[in-house]
Amino acid sequence: MTVVSVEHALAGKLPEGGEVTVRGWVRTLRGSAGLAFINVTDGSCFAPIQVVANDTLPNFDEIKRLTSGCSLIAKGVLVKSQGKGQSFEIQASGVEIVGWVEDPLTYPIQPKPMTPEFLREVAHLRPRTNLFGAVTRIRNCLAQAVHRFFHQNGFNWISTPIITTSDAEGAGQMFRVSTLDMVNLPRDATGNVDFSRDFFGKETFLTVSGQLNVEAYCLALSKVYTFGPTFRAENSHTTRHLAEFWMIEPEIAFADLAEDARLAEQFLKYVFRAVLDERGDDLAFLAERVDKNAISKLEAFINAPFEQIDYTDAVKLLQHAGKTFDFPVEWGLDLQTEHERWLTEEHIGRPVVVTNYPEHIKAFYMRLNDDGKTVAAMDVLAPGIGEIIGGSQREERLDVLDARMAQFGLDKEHYSWYRDFRRYGSVPHAGFGLGFERLVVYVCGLSNIRDAIPYPRAPGSAEF
């Protein structure tokens, strides 16, 4: 018995007339004059394969009762399909029914249109739909491409901790990790919670970023990256925010902001090319049902050189745009999505790297420029979504870093280990961060980031 994936069976690389076995789930079934036509999917590709069963099979009556979602093992001869819509089909010599759907009428995944809002309520079943099958395969393709890009460019992958004592962003929006009894919290002499009696002997949190930790390895191995889960206790109910998401964070030694921007451009174009080359079937479905520009926008992104513009110049352009924005535009305020999209879509018409932001709106670790007012920071803006990458050259001068930490109200002793990097062989270095789910949203044309991750975690939502 030669078990093959549906993708392999449809690819035209197996000998026609050979016997094969596929294992999967029923997508649809229709009958006609002693025949049953079963569309079977195993998730390996977008298209199902048609299994043709005739009434000579001993369990044909059982086969006719199959419904969407039932699991089976079908064996038979692989032949060119005479019908439209598929290249090959299987003339079944046997169909073993492995699992029935208990009640087809109440099975949540029906062969009919279903809203993303409904499917979020059954997130454990939604990968069985065409949409989320496609999104999941594209997510996997992107993840594989991320690792491949960095490996091919000499980066080492670093596993940074999920439990930490440091706030990498200085914003304080962190989830606390504790085994203390929440009903009877231990107190010290001053009445504060005594975290010395907690599991780790101190306050600990879920990480908001692996950047500070990965910098340590950058200053020893030169080119490194981390790719893992991060957590933000940000009480935001927008379509752009998650409480748990994955971050890609490369870091390069002996590098400035210009080199950081080049790396970001090379990286994005590489992973987009991988999706175009490897997941054309899924992109075609998304272009038909979700975002008509799913393919063309990636091709345009790859072929367009990035435009680079200083934040100060971007503000001037926006102020003279002849357009009324919902959010104010003035020097010293962060750019909002509507501003970013105007720059990329209406004014410049391609991806834009905005650099040198005001120092007070960016993180403490970003390198202070000579003007004393801006930092060597960048945001990569993409048409259709706005910011997709945020990065900077890091502050390598200990005295300047200490002053920045004081400005942000951070205890430098708490970050003594991070300051050590500036005390022992400090070098200029740079990096960026990219929320992986935002990348998935952009590629797939999704309208809500909660559809870009298998089990979304957001305020008031932690199901499954």
Curated annotation (Swiss-Prot):
Catalytic EC class: ligase
Superkingdom of origin: Bacteria
GO terms for MF: asparagine-tRNA ligase activity; ATP binding; nucleic acid binding
Catalytic activity, EC: 6.1.1.22
Signal peptide: none
Main localisation: cytoplasm
Keywords, in A-Z order: Aminoacyl-tRNA synthetase, ATP-binding, Cytoplasm, Ligase, Nucleotide-binding, Protein biosynthesis
Presence of keyword Cytoplasm: yes
GO biological process: asparaginyl-tRNA aminoacylation
Any one GO CC term of the record: cytoplasm
Subcellular location: Cytoplasm
PROSITE patterns reported in the protein's UniProt record: AA_TRNA_LIGASE_II
Catalytic activity, reaction form: tRNA(Asn) + L-asparagine + ATP = L-asparaginyl-tRNA(Asn) + AMP + diphosphate + H(+)
Record-stated family: Belongs to the class-II aminoacyl-tRNA synthetase family.
Subunit structure: Homodimer.
HAMAP family, per the entry: Asn_tRNA_synth
Listed name of the protein: Asparagine--tRNA ligase
Organism expressing this protein natively: Xanthomonas oryzae pv. oryzae (strain KACC10331 / KXO85)
Lineage summary: Bacteria, Pseudomonadati, Pseudomonadota, Gammaproteobacteria, Lysobacterales
